[in-house]
A protein has these predicted regions:
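Interfacial helix-start motif at the membrane-water boundary
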Residues: 54-70
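Membrane-interface extramembranous regions at the lipid-water interface
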Residues: 1-51, 71-106, 110-154, 158-176, ...
Length: 219
């Protein structure tokens, strides 16, 4: 987006985009590895007719979390710069400032909706839309957020179920292979969400560097 934004803000956004995309690529690789491993283990359980890997989901969930955390931090730094650039361009009607958009994923319950809305505004305003189109639907963001939320919900429920089964008097009886197939499905969704997000970061970063706002055009 060409306007009153300082070049240093655009350069910083590009640098942060590269870092965030690299960390997301590692997360994508980790989730794909988990998916493949879970599918193999599920196949073995289905063949044997027995549950062979009862405690595998929590271990894999921890592995995913360890790769998700640095990716989330890298994304937060990029989100901060992206929204700060919008403010520096003196755009009116922004609902999400840099601080609010950056903290949204880290606030319980709020992180179920606010990150998507903040990213949607960042996408639309970076692509030159006026404020009344700031929250219009974006297919890429819908795909990213749907994949991420469903994947995380399944992974969280699966991990909680296994831990409760292990450390309490409650027992969850599932057929062999069921938990691992659910793990593979959730990991696949998380991998897809990382792929969508890498592309979103690229599109928004390029838009801020090249797209001129309506206000700039008639200034």
């Amino acid at each position: 987006m060409i306007g009153m934004r300082v070049p240093s803000g655009l350069a910083s956004l590009r640098t942060r985009a590269v870092v965030a995309q690299a960390l997301l690529a590692l997360f994508l690789l980790a989730t794909l590895l988990v998916m493949l491993a879970a599918l193999y283990m599920a196949w073995r359980e289905l063949r044997s007719g027995y549950t062979l890997y009862l405690f595998t989901p929590p271990i894999f969930a921890l592995f995913i979390a360890l790769t998700l955390l640095p990716a989330a931090i890298g994304l937060s730094l990029w989100v901060w710069r992206g929204h700060a650039n919008l403010a520096a361009d003196h755009l009116t009607g922004l609902k999400y400032g840099a601080l609010k958009a950056t903290l949204a994923p880290w606030i319980p319950l709020a992180n179920l909706a606010l990150p998507k809305a903040a990213m949607r505004e960042l996408w639309n305003r970076s692509h030159g839309e006026e404020e009344w189109f700031g929250q219009q639907s974006v297919d890429a963001i819908n795909s990213w957020w749907t994949s991420y939320v469903i994947g995380m919900v399944i992974l969280t429920l699966l991990t909680a179920m296994v831990l409760i089964d292990r450390f309490s008097n409650l027992a969850f009886l599932t057929p062999p292979g069921t938990n691992l197939l659910a793990l593979a499905f959730s990991s696949g969704l998380l991998a897809a969400s990382a792929w969508f997000l890498i592309r979103i970061i690229s599109r928004i970063t390029t838009a801020q560097e090249t797209v001129t706002t309506v206000g700039d055009t008639f200034a």
